[in-house]
């Protein structure tokens, strides 16, 4: 059995590129940055860049490719964003039309790729601080929810923020806030702690993306801004084309989580 937690990003990306890994990437390449992916045509790229700049909690930019290039030169020189993500989603005019493991058949020379910070990147810091991460413990995808929180619009792009949730034992909440606040480029501190209904979540057991996590007695749901927000934006804004990673199936970068730490 492969020890994915201790393999290098390049090794894991090679396996993903050969379609030998096809599952959520949480816990893989321990200590390395993971990233959300958004790909749009050049004519929408400035609007999306502006949208991300106006919404840094949910869309912190790590890298942007040249037009027509699928190589993220800052985060993984030599990698190929057409094949090095385990699963992609294709949105056309707001509709999810396909979910694929390779983008070769969908690639166009006018596309621009954005890598956005992902909260998987601060999970190593949480584990190092003895804070449990339920979806890693139970080997499932992190739960994600569309909230009632409006993003700051830019050009064509507008809609609701998506959040990820991790149940945290009540005595460890302060420690969880401290651990994640060190990483603003991968969502940073939580945006909400406690009652899900305050941010428009009516059923904590039915996430919009990912899998439900068990919330045990004495635990509190804690919510972080999430890089799946652009997929909510795609459904609302209905751009001609937006390609993303499938929620939880991230791009694994070469730099380490600690490279993004501010403290």
UniProtKB/Swiss-Prot annotation:
GO terms for molecular function: lyase activity. InterPro entries: D-Glu_cyclase, Putative_hydro-lyase, UPF0317. Signal peptide: none annotated. It comes from the Bacteria. SUPFAM superfamilies: PSTPO5379-like. Keywords: Lyase. Gene3D superfamilies: PSTPO5379-like, PSTPO5379-like domain. It is an enzyme of class 4 (lyase). Its EC number is 4.2.1.-. Pfam families: D-Glu_cyclase (PF07286). Belongs to the D-glutamate cyclase family. This is Putative hydro-lyase Psyc_1103. It comes from Psychrobacter arcticus (strain DSM 17307 / VKM B-2377 / 273-4).
């Amino acid at each position: 059995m492969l020890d994915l937690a201790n393999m290098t990003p390049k090794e894991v990306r090679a396996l993903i590129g050969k379609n030998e890994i096809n599952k959520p990437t949480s816990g893989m390449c321990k200590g390395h940055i993971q990233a959300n992916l958004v790909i749009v045509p050049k004519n929408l790229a400035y609007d999306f860049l502006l949208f991300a700049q106006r919404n840094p909690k949910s869309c912190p930019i790590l890298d942007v490719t040249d037009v027509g290039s699928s190589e993220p030169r800052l985060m993984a020189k030599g990698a190929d964003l057409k094949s090095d993500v385990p699963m992609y989603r294709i949105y056309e005019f707001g509709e999810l039309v396909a979910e694929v493991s390779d983008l070769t058949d969908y690639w166009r020379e006018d596309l621009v790729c954005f890598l956005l910070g992902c909260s998987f990147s601060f999970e190593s810091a949480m584990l190092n601080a003895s804070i449990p991460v339920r979806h890693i413990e139970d080997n499932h995808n992190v739960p994600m929810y569309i909230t009632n929180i409006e993003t700051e619009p830019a050009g064509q792009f507008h809609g609701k923020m998506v959040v990820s949730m991790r149940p945290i034992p009540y005595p460890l909440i302060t420690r969880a806030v401290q651990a994640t606040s060190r990483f603003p480029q991968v969502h940073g501190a939580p945006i909400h702690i406690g009652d899900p209904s305050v941010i428009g979540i009516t059923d904590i057991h039915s996430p919009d993306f990912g899998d439900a996590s068990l919330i045990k007695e004495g635990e509190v749901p804690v919510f972080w801004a999430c890089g799946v927000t652009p997929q909510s934006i795609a459904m609302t804004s209905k751009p001609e084309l937006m390609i993303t990673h499938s929620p939880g199936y991230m791009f694994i970068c070469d730099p380490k989580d600690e490279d993004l730490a501010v403290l």
